[in-house]
Regions:
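Pepsin/retropepsin-fold aspartyl endopeptidases
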Residues: 1-403
């Protein structure tokens, strides 16, 4: 096979979401065509998806330093620095991208050891205040009590505006961001000095400060909600959301790659995880019409087991119930859509039969990664399950006991 045909194959693999296969093909091409800086940048993005931050930075920085002028490559480099806690380097990249609201805030934090743990080798298990409509965790923010919704669909920790001011969060620049169902919300970037989960502390976190939408707050009429705890924290650990026991477990990374389970150990591979730009958490899901499609894991979307854009209905073999509507909630507020039902849906070892979902009119995530994101997995699918996000190994595990 000639190199032109091989390149076409690599790009087709990537467009279909075959990330591991395309990585191997692009690595071969890069070895054969070392002058192709776009190949270096693509390998950097693939490493970013795999959360291999050292490799991502090496590929992307080399391509840019050798003359590549592509805003996407610079954005991916900024993200890699940001996840790694090198906030000063991230600030420089975001400034070059014109994102001055974020860049200025990160520059002020540039000399700090971001996400520093007060007990680096400790594990923590924190019970939830409630499980439905979404899991809520009681924490302390700069010493002030707070209730945070657990949401794998959020990147940074989000705090309500007035609460953040009262808690002494240092506020910086602003940007417009997009949340659930494509809803826009204005965010202010800030510096949180300490987030405490029991005796377990995480220091110097970048956070986003927003006005909590009334639609989200209305789902918790008897409990004040002060913000959202997202993947920016979860990705530092082997994170378990135990919907059975109603608790969050954070375990430090180990070299074994073995995920501890409630009744012993599970040995063997799980389902792949990827982290796209803005810490967008992706995994593989099976439906009758499509095996191993890539989906957004958004545990903070309630009101349906899953959600799909209108454009994917045919490919996924789904039919809409025209006489029914569902209402969900996310970081951007209420999400409304028509009801759809799948024959079955499988996430790792969890299989649900006849799950209800929502058809979204707007799903910006669908083509934002360079490959099709088929839809999102929500809270209702995960209820009564044990979900482990093994970020050190970039694998997802569902308990064998899921029913």
């Amino acid at each position: 096979m000639d190199l032109k045909t091989t390149e076409q194959e690599a790009r087709t693999q990537f467009a279909k979401g075959k990330i591991r296969e395309s990585t191997r093909t692009f690595q071969y091409l890069s070895e054969q065509l070392p002058e192709r800086l776009d190949m270096q940048a693509q390998l950097g993005y693939l490493a970013l998806l795999a959360n291999d931050l050292d490799a991502a930075i090496n590929y992307l920085a080399e391509a840019i330093n050798r003359g590549l002028r592509a805003s996407k490559a610079l954005a991916h480099l900024a993200e890699a620095y940001y996840r790694q806690g090198r906030l000063g380097s991230a600030a420089y990249c975001y400034h070059r991208l014109g994102r001055d609201g974020l860049a200025g805030t990160l520059a002020v934090m540039g000399e700090l050891d971001a996400y520093r743990l007060t007990q680096p080798r400790a594990s923590v298990e924190v019970p939830w205040v409630m499980t439905d409509p979404l899991p809520v965790l009681a924490v302390r923010v700069n010493g002030r009590d707070a209730n945070l919704v657990l949401d794998t669909g959020a990147g940074d920790t989000l705090l309500a505006t007035q609460f953040a001011i009262d808690a002494g969060v240092q506020l910086g620049g602003q940007e417009q961001r997009t949340f659930a169902g494509g809803r826009p919300a204005r965010v202010t970037y800030g510096h949180l000095e300490e987030l405490s989960l029991g005796d377990f502390g995480i220091q110097d976190l970048p956070v986003q400060v927003i006005d909590i939408p009334p639609g989200l707050a209305a789902w918790f009429p008897d409990l004040p909600i002060h913000g959202i705890l997202g993947t920016g924290v979860f990705a530092r650990f082997r994170t378990t959301l135990d919907y059975r026991c109603g608790c969050l477990r954070l375990e430090p990374p180990t070299e074994t790659g073995v995920t501890l389970r409630q009744n012993g150990q599970r040995v063997g591979p799980g389902t792949p995880l990827w982290l796209a730009e803005n810490q967008l958490l992706l995994t593989c899901v099976d439906l009758p019409a499509l095996d191993k499609g890539i989906w957004f894991l958004d545990s903070g979307m309630t009101g349906g087991s899953f959600a799909v854009p209108e454009s994917r209905l045919g490919a996924l073999g789904l039919k809409v119930d025209e006489g029914a509507a569902l209402v969900g909630a996310g970081g951007g507020g209420t999400v409304r859509g028509r009801k759809v039902r799948a024959d079955w849906l499988r996430l790792d070892r969890l299989c649900r039969y006849q799950p209800d979902g929502v058809v979204l009119e707007d799903f910006p995530v669908e083509q934002s990664c360079g490959f099709a994101v088929q839809g999102l997995i929500g809270h209702d699918l995960l209820r009564d399950s044990i979900l482990t996000l093994d970020f050190p190994a970039m694998q997802l595990f569902m308990s064998e006991e899921n029913r």
